[in-house]
Amino acid sequence: MLHYPAELWYNKTVIESKLLKASNILKNAGCTSVYLFGSQAKGNARSDSDIDLGVFGLVPSLFFKTHFLLENELDMKVDLVDFDHEKSFFEMLNQIGELKKIG
Protein backbone atom coordinates (compact mmCIF):
# COMPACT_ATOMS: atom_id res chain seq x y z
CA MET A 1 0.00 0.00 0.00
CA LEU A 2 1.39 3.40 -1.00
CA HIS A 3 1.06 6.28 1.47
CA TYR A 4 0.59 9.91 0.43
CA PRO A 5 0.56 13.12 2.51
CA ALA A 6 -2.94 14.60 2.77
CA GLU A 7 -1.90 17.93 1.22
CA LEU A 8 -1.02 16.40 -2.14
CA TRP A 9 -3.20 17.31 -5.13
CA TYR A 10 -4.64 13.94 -5.91
CA ASN A 11 -6.95 11.50 -4.27
CA LYS A 12 -4.97 8.46 -3.11
CA THR A 13 -7.74 6.13 -4.25
CA VAL A 14 -7.66 7.54 -7.79
CA ILE A 15 -3.89 7.10 -8.12
CA GLU A 16 -4.00 3.57 -6.71
CA SER A 17 -6.79 2.74 -9.15
CA LYS A 18 -4.67 4.06 -12.04
CA LEU A 19 -1.68 2.04 -10.86
CA LEU A 20 -3.79 -1.12 -10.72
CA LYS A 21 -5.10 -0.43 -14.22
CA ALA A 22 -1.53 0.21 -15.46
CA SER A 23 -0.29 -3.01 -13.89
CA ASN A 24 -3.11 -4.99 -15.53
CA ILE A 25 -2.42 -3.44 -18.95
CA LEU A 26 1.28 -4.20 -18.65
CA LYS A 27 0.73 -7.76 -17.41
CA ASN A 28 -1.68 -8.38 -20.30
CA ALA A 29 1.04 -7.12 -22.67
CA GLY A 30 3.39 -9.79 -21.30
CA CYS A 31 5.36 -7.94 -18.63
CA THR A 32 6.71 -10.20 -15.92
CA SER A 33 7.36 -7.39 -13.39
CA VAL A 34 6.04 -3.83 -13.09
CA TYR A 35 7.65 -1.14 -10.92
CA LEU A 36 6.70 2.39 -9.92
CA PHE A 37 9.43 4.98 -9.39
CA GLY A 38 9.80 8.76 -9.38
CA SER A 39 7.62 11.28 -7.58
CA GLN A 40 4.59 8.97 -7.34
CA ALA A 41 6.73 6.32 -5.61
CA LYS A 42 8.31 8.85 -3.28
CA GLY A 43 4.95 10.38 -2.38
CA ASN A 44 5.80 13.92 -3.49
CA ALA A 45 3.88 14.11 -6.78
CA ARG A 46 2.31 17.37 -7.90
CA SER A 47 -0.67 18.13 -10.11
CA ASP A 48 1.52 18.03 -13.23
CA SER A 49 3.40 14.86 -12.26
CA ASP A 50 3.45 11.87 -14.55
CA ILE A 51 3.59 8.21 -13.62
CA ASP A 52 7.02 6.60 -14.00
CA LEU A 53 6.83 2.87 -14.66
CA GLY A 54 9.56 0.35 -15.33
CA VAL A 55 8.97 -3.15 -16.64
CA PHE A 56 10.65 -6.46 -17.32
CA GLY A 57 9.43 -8.85 -19.99
CA LEU A 58 7.75 -6.48 -22.45
CA VAL A 59 8.34 -7.61 -26.03
CA PRO A 60 10.13 -4.72 -27.81
CA SER A 61 7.67 -4.77 -30.71
CA LEU A 62 4.83 -3.98 -28.25
CA PHE A 63 6.61 -1.16 -26.39
CA PHE A 64 5.14 1.86 -28.21
CA LYS A 65 1.67 0.36 -28.59
CA THR A 66 1.59 -0.42 -24.86
CA HIS A 67 2.90 3.03 -23.94
CA PHE A 68 0.19 4.66 -26.07
CA LEU A 69 -2.48 2.43 -24.50
CA LEU A 70 -1.31 3.32 -20.98
CA GLU A 71 -1.50 7.07 -21.59
CA ASN A 72 -4.95 6.78 -23.18
CA GLU A 73 -6.40 4.50 -20.51
CA LEU A 74 -4.92 6.40 -17.55
CA ASP A 75 -5.57 9.82 -19.10
CA MET A 76 -2.19 11.13 -17.97
CA LYS A 77 1.45 11.22 -19.04
CA VAL A 78 3.34 7.99 -18.46
CA ASP A 79 7.09 7.48 -18.66
CA LEU A 80 7.67 3.82 -19.48
CA VAL A 81 11.14 2.31 -19.11
CA ASP A 82 12.12 -1.14 -20.36
CA PHE A 83 14.34 -2.41 -17.53
CA ASP A 84 15.44 -5.34 -19.69
CA HIS A 85 17.38 -2.74 -21.71
CA GLU A 86 18.08 -0.32 -18.83
CA LYS A 87 19.42 -2.69 -16.17
CA SER A 88 21.87 -0.18 -14.70
CA PHE A 89 19.01 2.30 -14.19
CA PHE A 90 16.96 -0.41 -12.46
CA GLU A 91 19.92 -1.30 -10.22
CA MET A 92 20.49 2.36 -9.29
CA LEU A 93 16.80 2.90 -8.44
CA ASN A 94 16.78 -0.31 -6.43
CA GLN A 95 19.94 0.68 -4.57
CA ILE A 96 18.54 4.06 -3.51
CA GLY A 97 15.22 2.46 -2.51
CA GLU A 98 13.06 4.28 -5.06
CA LEU A 99 11.38 1.25 -6.63
CA LYS A 100 7.96 -0.02 -5.62
CA LYS A 101 6.84 -3.27 -7.22
CA ILE A 102 3.21 -2.95 -8.30
CA GLY A 103 2.87 -6.03 -10.47
Task: List each model region and its residues.
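Periplasmic OmpA-like peptidoglycan-binding domain that tethers envelope proteins to the cell wall
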Residues: 49-51
